Amino acid sequence: MPAIEVGRLCVKTRGREAGRKCVIVEIIDDNFVLITGPKDVSGVKRRRANINHIEVLPEKINIQPGASDEEVKKALEEAGLLDFMRERVRIELKPGLL
């Protein structure tokens, strides 16, 4: 099972959207992926993200690479994951980062 793949759910661990869940929409290169919340579901805008700034979750939805926000939202509804996506995750800071 590859960890970074299209349709995989993940949590942003850095930046202003830290703790919010998102979906990998497209793999750009070895270091970056295109993610989306969609914004009206979890608050994450469609944007490029470094793979070191996301934490992959075991859940996966079936979408095509480059899927629109509407297609992602529909796939989340079909999988029954809309409420799961709206929940935030608490990011624990390591003592060295304080």
UniProtKB/Swiss-Prot annotation:
A biological-process GO annotation: ribosomal large subunit biogenesis
Keywords of the record: Ribonucleoprotein, Ribosomal protein
Gene3D superfamilies: 2.30.30.30
InterPro entries: KOW, Rib_uL2_dom2, Ribosomal_eL14, Ribosomal_eL14_arc, Ribosomal_eL14_KOW, Translation_prot_SH3-like_sf
Any single Gene Ontology cellular-component annotation: cytosolic large ribosomal subunit
Any one GO molecular-function label of the UniProt entry: structural constituent of ribosome
Pfam families: KOW
Bilayer-crossing regions: none
Organism superkingdom: Archaea
Assigned protein family: Belongs to the eukaryotic ribosomal protein eL14 family.
Protein name as it appears in the record: Large ribosomal subunit protein eL14
Organism (species): Hyperthermus butylicus (strain DSM 5456 / JCM 9403 / PLM1-5)
